[in-house]
Amino acid sequence: MYNYLDFEKPVADLEGQILELKKLAQEQGSVEMSDEIRRLEKRSADALKDIYRKLTPWQKTQIARHPDRPHCLEYIDRLFTEFTPLAGDRKFANDEALQTGFGRFNGQAVAIIGQEKGSDTKTRLKHNFGSARPEGYRKAVRIMEMADRFQLPLITFVDTAGAYPGVSAEERGQAEAIARSTAECLRLRVPVISIIIGEGGSGGAIAIAVANRVYMLEHSIYSVISPEGAASILWHDSTRAKDAASSMRITAQDLFDLKVIDGVIPEPMGGAHRGKEAVIDAAGDIITASLRSMKDIDGETLKQERRQKFLEIGRNI
């Protein structure tokens, strides 16, 4: 059984009936229920298509936050070989919210940075729900510097509600760490590819997403502030997050139209959590195509194109 979202209730009811009938048929050794099971499966598939054909921005936000979506470490495990993680910022500590290291993608050595939310209570606490502290961004800068030094393409996976806003993080220079990470992205003379796999929240996301090629999963979101945060500022009422989401143009489709991103990666019907391997492989195909398109571009041109790309975003929005 999946973790169903509120708006998926019709599908949840039908799939619940299907499971009950399958269990009953197995217990009784009966094949007479197969026609009814097939009928319900068709109704369930049709209901899912109908719901996902007309998703609202707020519903997409809920899908982007779905606890069962594939996370950064799952992408790393499936797409890369010989992954060697690097830990620590050489200044204070290691931040598990940001996963960094080196590996091989289709045999090519690459640098990898990704935000990991965790998949259960224990790992979510370990990874601080994907909200990085200053030491996480300083660790990311370490990897960027090494990628530049050894001329390795950089691939980043973005999935965060935002950088950690706690007092301790502010005391250790959270704003400076985010700014330095963003600036380092702009300085690199290697191909940089960023994929937003869930939430892309505020400076915590942009700090590792200033890339030559930026892609979003079909039901991911990308914004300067969460819908709840925007609602709190605009209307002093966080419960109006649904209204805020509708106004903010935070979906992959909106941001592609605005030329903020370079493309949208399709998800299986029902979201990435219903077909993890398929969506990770689709992301891998995009990475392959992006690396191929940049392989003959010199480092200075890559740097200047990246800077120009983000200057244009600032001018046009």
Swiss-Prot record:
Transmembrane segments: none annotated. Keywords: ATP-binding, Cytoplasm, Fatty acid biosynthesis, Fatty acid metabolism, Lipid biosynthesis, Lipid metabolism, Nucleotide-binding, Transferase. InterPro entries: Acetyl_CoA_COase_a_su (IPR001095), ClpP/crotonase-like_dom_sf (IPR029045), COA_CT_C (IPR011763). PROSITE patterns: COA_CT_CTER (PS50989). One of its GO terms (cellular component) is acetyl-CoA carboxylase complex. Residues 40-293 form the CoA carboxyltransferase C-terminal domain. It is found in: Cytoplasm. It comes from the Bacteria. Pathway: Lipid metabolism; malonyl-CoA biosynthesis; malonyl-CoA from acetyl-CoA: step 1/1. GO terms for biological process: fatty acid biosynthetic process; malonyl-CoA biosynthetic process. Its EC number is 2.1.3.15. It catalyses: N(6)-carboxybiotinyl-L-lysyl-[protein] + acetyl-CoA = N(6)-biotinyl-L-lysyl-[protein] + malonyl-CoA. GO terms for molecular function: acetyl-CoA carboxylase activity; ATP binding; carboxyl- or carbamoyltransferase activity. PANTHER family: ACETYL-COENZYME A CARBOXYLASE CARBOXYL TRANSFERASE SUBUNIT ALPHA, ACETYL-COENZYME A CARBOXYLASE CARBOXYL TRANSFERASE SUBUNIT ALPHA, CHLOROPLASTIC. Acetyl-CoA carboxylase is a heterohexamer composed of biotin carboxyl carrier protein (AccB), biotin carboxylase (AccC) and two subunits each of ACCase subunit alpha (AccA) and ACCase subunit beta (AccD). Belongs to the AccA family. Component of the acetyl coenzyme A carboxylase (ACC) complex. First, biotin carboxylase catalyzes the carboxylation of biotin on its carrier protein (BCCP) and then the CO(2) group is transferred by the carboxyltransferase to acetyl-CoA to form malonyl-CoA. This is Acetyl-coenzyme A carboxylase carboxyl transferase subunit alpha. It comes from Brucella anthropi (strain ATCC 49188 / DSM 6882 / CCUG 24695 / JCM 21032 / LMG 3331 / NBRC 15819 / NCTC 12168 / Alc 37). The lineage of its organism: Bacteria, Pseudomonadati, Pseudomonadota, Alphaproteobacteria, Hyphomicrobiales.
